[in-house]
Amino acid sequence: MAMKIRLARGGSKKRPFYRIVAADSRMPRDGRFIEKLGTYNPLLPKDSEERVKMDIEKIQAWLDKGAQPTDRVARMLEAAGVREKTERNNPNKAKPGKKAQERAEEKAAKAAEAAEAADAE
């Protein structure tokens, strides 16, 4: 049984509220879960203590049993100091896309032509 520590959505339309739960990965997102481990209320300010509440002992027990946290829950656990922060690497993020590179090359070529024309005069 593949266990996940994930967010189960509650609340009403436009008013989300999440439970942090340990659930079988094959169950629906908001469906059956094994144990409730905490809550997350994204409507509260980021500095509010009530925004994320977690039972750290229960979460650590599930992690020791082999449960895998989802990406969002993993970030919450990193912020709480339960897990070490994993290094995220996206080397292509800083590079411009194809069209932007083409535009930059065209602009550089025009600038070079203008510089040559200015030198020729």
From Swiss-Prot:
Region of interest (Disordered), residue spans: 80-121
Keywords carried by this UniProt record: Ribonucleoprotein, Ribosomal protein
Spans through the membrane: none
A UniProt-annotated Pfam family: Ribosomal_S16
UniProt xrefs under InterPro entries: Ribosomal_bS16, Ribosomal_bS16_dom_sf
Alphabetized GO MF terms: structural constituent of ribosome
Top-level taxon in the UniProt lineage: Bacteria
Gene3D superfamilies referenced in this protein's UniProt entry, alphabetically: 3.30.1320.10
Coiled coil: none
Record-level GO BP terms: translation
A GO cellular component annotation in the UniProt record: cytoplasm
Residue ranges, compositional bias (Basic and acidic residues): 81-90, 99-110
PANTHER family: 30S RIBOSOMAL PROTEIN S16 (PTHR12919), SMALL RIBOSOMAL SUBUNIT PROTEIN BS16M (PTHR12919:SF20)
Family of this protein: Belongs to the bacterial ribosomal protein bS16 family.
UniProt name for this protein: Small ribosomal subunit protein bS16
Organism: Ruegeria sp. (strain TM1040) (Silicibacter sp.)
The organism's taxonomic lineage, starting at the top: Bacteria, Pseudomonadati, Pseudomonadota, Alphaproteobacteria, Rhodobacterales
